[in-house]
Regions:
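Short linear sequence elements within intrinsically disordered, low-complexity coil regions
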Residues: 48, 90, 136, 141-144, ...
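Alpha-helical coiled-coil scaffolding segments
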Residues: 152-213
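Papain-like cysteine protease catalytic cores
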Residues: 56-179
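Intrinsically disordered, low-complexity segments enriched in small/polar residues
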Residues: 15, 26, 62, 79, ...
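Short, well-structured alpha-helical patches and their helix-loop capping segments
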Residues: 2, 14, 146-150, 199
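Non-catalytic, low-structured ubiquitin/UBL-interacting segments
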Residues: 1-77, 93-98, 205-213
Length: 213
């Protein structure tokens, strides 16, 4: 493994640590301060949750004096180094057209998103170089490889590629709910964005809102 590739993998682990810390700050207090959030909510209108995907998670958050909840359906993706970009490609396609891309098209779209994200890294070098570990140019070159794991810098750059927020969730210990660890790009690009699930072991999957009722 090259030194540049090792830095990419190390950064993915670093991003996991940042995400875990953010999750404790972002989601914990809202749920703890509103015990009634555990009640069954009324869901907004969404496509019905299908039984063919692996799992359905609920996200509960405090809104004013009450609670709001959304069900998210998991769309598994291959763990081939492209999982971040595959997840964003899958979630974007489902949100736009209600259907997932074919495997070959999804792979091509994931690679396209990867290269556009790296283009954004280079374009925004002055903004992001400080949190890229090691040599910036070597990092960008390594990140273009299909097997390189994407992490927090790439998620942020994908918000500029899509001109849309990307919200990252992690499963809660109860294995039935998820907690948001960050809505990247939400300040710059308001509105509903793309949701992805981070498992804490370097793997991402696509999430889409659905209706369990």
């Amino acid at each position: 493994m090259s030194a540049a590739a090792a830095r990419v993998i190390a950064h993915a682990a670093c991003a996991w640590g940042l995400a875990s810390a953010a999750s404790a700050r972002a989601a914990g207090p809202a749920v703890r301060s509103h015990p009634q959030c555990a009640a069954v909510p009324t869901f907004v209108s969404r496509p019905r949750c299908a039984s063919l995907t692996r799992a359905v998670y609920r996200h509960v958050e405090a809104v004013g004096d009450g609670c709001d909840a959304t069900s998210y359906e998991v769309y598994p993706v291959a763990g081939d180094g492209r999982c971040l970009f595959r997840s964003v490609a899958a979630a974007t396609a489902i949100r736009a057209d209600g259907a997932r891309l074919s495997p070959d098209v999804e792979t091509a779209e994931a690679d396209r998103l990867r290269n556009l994200a790296v283009d954004q890294l280079r374009r925004r070098r002055a903004e992001v170089e400080w949190f890229i570990e090691g040599d910036f140019d070597a990092y960008c070159d390594a990140m273009r490889r299909p097997i390189a794991w994407g992490g927090e810098p790439e998620i942020l750059m994908l918000t500029h590629v899509l001109e849309s927020p990307v919200e990252v969730f992690m499963p809660s210990p109860d294995a039935r709910t998820v907690r948001s660890i960050g809505a990247y790009g939400a300040d710059e690009y308001p509105g509903e964005g793309v949701a992805i699930l981070f498992h804490g072991a370097g793997h991402y999957e696509a999430l889409t809102p659905c209706d369990e009722s």
